[in-house]
Amino acid sequence: MKLSRRNVAVPAGVAALALAVVAIVSWLPRSDAAPVPDGSDRLPASTTTVAVAQSLTSTSSTTLAGPQTRFVLPGDDLAAMVAANPPLTTFVLAPGIHRGHSIEPRDGQVFRGEPGAVLSGAVVLSGFAERDGIWFIGGQGSDGQFHGQCDDDRPRCGYPEELFVDDAVLEHVESVSAVGPGRWHFDYDQDTVYLGNDPAGRVVELGVVPSAFHGDADNVTIEGLVIEKYAAPAQEGVIDSRRDREDRVGGSGWQIIDNVVRWNHGVGIAATTGAVVAGNQVYENGQLGLAAKGLGVTIEGNDIYGNNTAGFNSGWEAGGSKFAFTSGLVVRNNHVHDNDGPGLWTDIDNIDTRYEGNRVIDNDRMGIFHEISYDAVIADNEVRGNGFGFSAWLWGAGIAVSTSINVEIYGNVVEGNGDGIVGIEQDRSDAPASYGPLSLTGLDVHDNFVSGNEGWSGVGQDIGSNAVFTSAGNRFYDNTFDQAGTHFFWLNEEVTYKEWLEFGQS
């Protein structure tokens, strides 16, 4: 007879032992007892009781905390706990706001959030004074370090601090005279914050901590956390498996799973070799949602949207994502939408890239952009509504390949973008070109559905040579184009569909 747990009797001795454990647990310190540095007394009584009782009656998975599990309450010094515990320790963060932590993990450590656990890089500001309809508070020290290139109308994008009123980010303006509703100014010389909204009855927070997790440890796991309001500089991640932005190696094997990463200044998540970034919501960060470098990085099943809130120049580096110096990068089944910049962007020495099954919708610049890089497959993506923020020439493409070698594009739906599918040849002698000379060569575009794009599909160059059309092996074939008019580009001019076919493209 197949036995189930409900009809298995528990031996009397085991039952007695379970009762004894319950009695012992009732004596253990409560979770609000005075903390110890390593968090080792943090076993909530209810969790321990259930876990031990289950372990005595079943071999199924339980919530029993092992000797390397530490429980973290809001107010605990998490960085000190990490330093006091060995590699492979698991830290379970309790519900609530954990403020001010910047963590350098050790190898194999796990950081897991219970529902409602929030890591915040912000401090709460109170005690504002008011003068002429502007509120201000002193004593807010910061180095005021600027990094990045900004849009003309957002000249303070490069300062990492952000100000929030009831979780809404305000625009950082250049002077006190420009402060008004929805705007603020940080006078770095006087250490004073000026605010154009009455803070009475509101929660006002200033992002000041540069990162939540950083460093080059290996095999770190970060799971189930809300991570918000960190003052990460541009080109640095709030979660970052590097020591700094110049580090092109970093740690390997990070698992960044099922987190919410929002309202931070620089990059939401910056991953390196062997990382898996999956199931995260990465939204409304100041510069980029995601970045990666290294070998074998997987980006899968993330929702990436609304990034570049600080107003960085998206031609410099801003938007949904940017990947550089990768090999074997896989970007699969992500929803990438409404970013102020490109949606998915591989730029500089990427090789063996695969973009597959992504929904790339309504991004301000190109939907998918593969630039000064090498072998790639762009397959089975849905690409709609991208490129209207800058659609001059061929730059509003749903899918764009620029000065890159051996890229195959197939099975995509490319509809309603500024341009369709394009290849671009430029002089990029400034590029590292680590895998050989760069040019638009071997572009293989087939079996795509292309419809309703305002501009063109095809190939263009600005180097004064027609070789890209005649001898570089760039071709379109077996595609379905559902649009009339001169929506095709060849020999550096717009052509009709009939002329497109006569050039041997389809």
Please provide the spans of the model-predicted regions.
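N-terminal export and membrane-targeting signals
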Residues: 1-16
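Bacterial N-terminal signal peptides
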Residues: 15-23
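C-terminal region of N-terminal signal peptides and the immediate post-cleavage residues
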Residues: 22-46
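Extracellular mucin-like PTS domains
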Residues: 46-51, 55-63
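Extracellular polysaccharide-degrading/modifying enzymes targeting complex plant/algal/animal polysaccharides
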Residues: 56, 64-252, 497, 501-506
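Glycine- and acidic/polar-rich repeat regions and solenoidal domains
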Residues: 102, 211-213, 228, 232-253, ...
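Active-site and donor-binding regions of nucleotide-sugar-utilizing enzymes
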Residues: 279
